[in-house]
Amino acid sequence: MAVNGISRYIRLWNHVANPAEYILRKGERHHRDLHFTTKPLPVHFRVSAALYQVFKELFMADVYEIDALVNTLPADPVVIDIGANAGFFDIQLLSKVDRATIYAYEPMPANVETLRHTLQQNPRLQQSVRLFEMAVTGQPLDWLDLFAEAEENDQVVASRFAGFNENNTQTITVPCVTLTDIIWTHDLRSVDLLKMDCEGSEYDIIYHTAPELLRRISRMVIEVHDMDKGRNNIGAFDAYVRSLGYTTTHAPINSFCHALEAVRR
């Protein structure tokens, strides 16, 4: 569950070695990138103004409760990251565990460029993160139209739904892969963690992946967005995931988005 108030600064102190970069220099973010180093294992990465809120969600609000999450994983976990964004979740994870095998999927060019730069700056991460510039779907598609902000440098969050965000006025077309194909192509007989933050696509992905493949996943952490009153809302989604044999918990992030954690029974 996301933290707030002074607790955010405690989490920041726990996760980065140079919290003063945020505390003293966050006002400079519109003029230069902020630069951070994680702890206990050092990962060097940059945060642009466009990524500022994403950074705060993970390293301050700590929406994935990363320390508690890591304690549930094996020493060398296999992870699928759908909606990797600029890789902040992968950075956070690899600041806590020395090794992992992460299949990271991100369709937005600006995010991919940022994550590639981070990988180049941190050779250890190159051994763990396999980056794919693709969107993930449930039903097979070769290409998918995503709606994003007009300015290329601000295109850090996009959705397949035109009305998801009123600022998403530009369409970009990206290549796709299904979760089914990810599991089969990489011969993933077991997956320790599926992390998913894909702005409404979570329904297509989970509802259209065979239950026997989903059950290969031990744990899931998913941002679930309320899209309608039918099947595309937290109540229906939670019930479906539980029907697959998972124990679930969820908590609101904001008025239309929820953090759901599912553990296979």
Q: For each predicted feature, which ranges?
A:
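Phosphate/nucleotide-binding beta-alpha loop and adjacent structural elements of enzyme active sites
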Residues: 1-265
